[in-house]
Amino acid sequence: MAAKIRRDDEIIVLTGKDKGKRGKVKNVLSAGKVIVEGINLVKKHQKPVPALNQPGGIVEKEAAIQVSNIALFNAATGKADRVGFRFEDGKKVRFFKSNSETIK
C-alpha cells in the first residue's frame, strides 16, 4: 500500500497539545508514526558521554506522532486535506481530494 504521508510533506496537526500547528515531516516510521519538525517536543534527560565529548543535561527533541493525528496541508485552500491516489501517464500519484490538485 502506498504511503499517504511522505518525508518533506507539509502537515497540520489535528489533535493533541500541538493542534493546529504546521510542520515538515522529517521521518516516517514503520509503526504508523511520523516525526515532524518542531511538533511534539519532549524533554529528554541525557547522561554525559566523555568519550564523545558530549555534555549531559536536559535536551528537547521531537517525539513521534501518530499518522491518524495529522493531515496533509493544502496550500491552495489553506486547510487540512485528505489524500487520494490516481494514475497519470501510467504512474500512481497522490492528489488532494478537495480540489483534485496533484501533490508534488
Curated annotation (Swiss-Prot):
Example GO molecular function: rRNA binding
CDD domains linked: KOW_RPL26
GO biological process per UniProt: translation
Pfam entry (one): ribosomal_L24
Function: One of two assembly initiator proteins, it binds directly to the 5'-end of the 23S rRNA, where it nucleates assembly of the 50S subunit.
Annotated Gene Ontology cellular component terms: ribonucleoprotein complex; ribosome
UniProt-listed PROSITE patterns: RIBOSOMAL_L24
Family of this protein: Belongs to the universal ribosomal protein uL24 family.
The keyword Repeat is assigned to this record: no
Entry protein name: Large ribosomal subunit protein uL24
Organism for this UniProt entry: Serratia proteamaculans (strain 568)
Gene: rplX
Annotated keywords: Ribonucleoprotein, Ribosomal protein, RNA-binding, rRNA-binding
